[in-house]
Structure formats: C-alpha cells, structure tokens
C-alpha cells in the first residue's frame, strides 16, 4: 500500500544484500526497484563487502589461511570478477565482492550524484538526485524480482501486485 499510495521516503538503505546476489543483472534489478522508490530529495545508502574484505582476499591467496578456519574454504568463480563460492559445510553460497568502480557503475545509471567510499572491508554508496526510470526497465525488474523461486520450487507470484503498485505510484508522482 505504501508504494501504491506514493509514500515518500527521505532515505533508503541497502545493507549487505548486494553481496548475496550472484549475478550482475539481478543486482541491477534490485537497485532499479529501490531507485523507483526515490524522489529527487531521497538519499539511497548502500553497503556491501568489497574486494578488500578478508573473505575475498583469501581466495586470491592474500590473507592467511590456517587450520582453525579451514571450514571457511572458498573458491573464486570465473564468470564475473569478485565472486566466490564458500560455506560448503552448511549450505554453499555465492558471494559478490565489489570494487569501488563496480559499485559506482551499479548505481550511476539510476542516480545523478553517486559518492563511493571504502572502509573496513566494505564499499559504500551515497546516491542522490534519482534519474527518471523508463517504465519498461522498471517492469522488467519487477517481473524478475517478484517471481523468484523458493527452495521448494514454488514461486513468489507477486508480479501483478508489484506492477500494479508501482504503476499507480508512477501515475500519482509523475
């Protein structure tokens, strides 16, 4: 209801979500949807693990690996830079570690002002002055994100509801 009714947000935060999304196009969908929630005055803040973080440096042989953390063994994946797979003892997961340049390139299509910083193994973005998102681009993101599969194979099935809410938002906010 908040989306459809045009609720205006002063700030939006994306914390550690983007390093759990293994494919670039999927990360773009998330940023697109978050940008669609912004008004010209809204600030979007994002944080994700950077390639300077120990978890990624280990797969490049740049961080000490000893027997006590052998359960944290991970491997680099070659389909995109900064991606590794690990946590084999529980449930394997893919993690994306970002460079400052990659983070800038992820947000700059959606915002006119993008400031990127790196601190303590994280890359951070502060985004302002949202760009107008073509409806077709937003609809593509909504169709993907609101029909993701659950582990049992069923799907979210919220495409129509999401499209309706964002379409109404576009109509009332322009």
Stretch-by-stretch model annotation:
Residues 1-4, 43-174:
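Class I (Rossmann-like) S-adenosyl-L-methionine-dependent methyltransferase catalytic domain
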Residues 7-10, 42:
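Short coil/turn segments at beta-strand junctions that form active-site/ligand-binding loops
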Residues 9-26:
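A short SAM/SAH-binding and catalytic strip from SAM-dependent methyltransferases
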Residues 14-16, 38, 47-48:
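Short His-Asn-centered micro-motif
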Residues 18, 30, 50:
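Flexible, active-site-proximal loop/turn residues at the rims of small-molecule/cofactor binding pockets
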Residues 26-43:
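A short glycine-rich, Lys/Arg-flanked "PGG" loop and its adjoining helix->strand segment in the class I
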